[in-house]
Amino acid sequence: MGEGDEKPSDWIPAEFRAPLFFHQRGMLNAAREGDDTNPEKKSSSTQFTIVTGMVYDDAKLDNCQQRIDDWTNGTFKLTPEMRETYKTIGGAAHLDGSYTVFGRVVSGMEVVEKIEHATTDQHDRPIHDFRINKAKITKK
């Protein structure tokens, strides 16, 4: 992960490709600045998060869809398959249509869970750095 000192010129255009890529548990999404400074939702070229999230029920998914409709003018919809995934595997449905998803963890979620529960500072950054020593990029 980068140190967070990139310039807006380093940002990457947003790309939303649901239902192929959405914020189910284990997916990678690009970090970004907030809508007030980044209304085009451009992605960081150096920072990302790994989605852990939660398991949803229909009421929570309906609430998420309302919020997503507000910021996408109704252009981004949770499909029945996405809803089922959120109700069984979990994730972060509230991020759909707002953050670019670009990959997934295929093994090692137990390590992600350790990172998730690490002690953090006032900016929600882990006190101790975590390093990814090995990653494999595959094409679907």
Language-model features: locations:
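Cyclophilin-like peptidyl-prolyl cis-trans isomerases
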Residues: M1-K140
